[in-house]
Design a protein with these regions (language model features):
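Bacterial N-terminal signal peptides that target proteins for export
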Residues: 1-11
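Expand to "…catalyze enediolate/carbanion chemistry for C-C bond making/breaking, isomerization
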Residues: 12-15, 20-285
Length: 285
């Protein structure tokens, strides 16, 4: 009987140590989400936009100079199956995959996180509850209510470490959201508040863009309120790539494949001409 008690005590002790070790893994493990690490360090982070389901195009963008990919599922017709195929075929590229989901719904965020992305971008956040939902469905208990799937893209300790590596980006795009900016920025688990330039103008009755928007005091006042609420809360501030030199902004939605092609095609063509032709892509010689 004494031996049984000793064995039972040893088993209980081992289980307790295992649980403690697993808990510590999530707290002390270095971030494999390199984009989130840069976010936390206050460095500039650029996410290149991906709007088409071509795996080769995705891999080209994901292995460029970008910190992360902004996989667009709000304003595109891509399916989760197509996005999953892209991510799977590209493995673990340099740029960390983020997805802009259509809404802060369990089904959308569950699918996105199960695909292996390490960033959830939620559009049109007007309320504290919607920001809380983004965190809730993106993170495992005790930080959220995400159901556990079988993803092992980021290692065997994925379940224990991913909460610390999951970036949450909240987009404020309407006057209602601006009015709630202080409360939204105070939601635990949020990393970035993104001032959505285009829709901020669209939903406020100031739909013009670019140079025409400069000097609009109403529009600029909304941007300033988002700016101040975000930095006051100790979070990082996001915006369009055109704002990369704007004070306080460190997270940006960058250009997509078309911009890379526009910028790179002349270099490739001129380089080929200078070398007298050479190989031409996948064309047979």
């Amino acid at each position: 009987m004494t031996i049984s008690r000793r064995v039972l005590a040893a088993v209980i002790g081992a289980l307790a140590l295992t649980a403690l070790a697993q808990a510590q893994v999530g707290k002390t493990a270095p971030l494999y989400n390199t984009a989130l690490q840069k976010i936390k360090d206050g460095k500039q982070v650029v996410c290149s936009t991906v709007s088409s389901p071509d795996p080769d195009a995705y891999c080209a963008v994901a292995n460029s100079a970008a910190d992360c990919t902004w996989i667009e599922m709000q304003h595109s017709t891509m399916t989760y199956y197509q996005v999953g195929d892209m991510i799977k075929r590209c493995g673990r590229p340099k740029a960390i995959p983020f997805i802009r989901v259509p809404d802060a719904l369990e089904g959308d965020i569950q699918k996105a996180t199960d695909l292996g992305v390490l960033g959830i971008i939620v559009p049109t956040v007007d309320t504290v509850e919607k920001a809380q939902a983004a965190v809730k469905w993106a993170k495992f208990p005790p930080d959220g209510r995400r159901s556990q799937g079988g993803n092992r893209m980021w290692g065997e300790n994925y379940r224990e470490t991913v909460n610390a590596n999951m970036a949450i980006v909240i987009m404020i795009e309407t006057p209602i959201g601006v009015d709630a900016a202080d409360k939204i920025a105070a939601v635990p688990g949020v990393d970035v508040i993104f001032a959505a330039s285009t829709d901020l103008g669209n939903f406020s009755g100031h739909p013009y863009t670019g140079a025409a928007r400069k000097g609009d005091t109403v529009y600029e006042a909304m941007v300033t309120r988002i700016h101040d609420a975000t930095l006051k809360a100790g979070l990082r501030l996001g915006g369009p790539f055109a704002w990369k030199d704007r004070p306080g902004f460190t997270f940006f939605q960058g250009p997509g494949l078309a911009a890379f092609v526009d910028a790179g095609a002349p270099i490739v063509i001129q380089g080929g001409a200078a070398q007298g032709g050479g190989r031409r892509g996948n064309q047979k010689q």
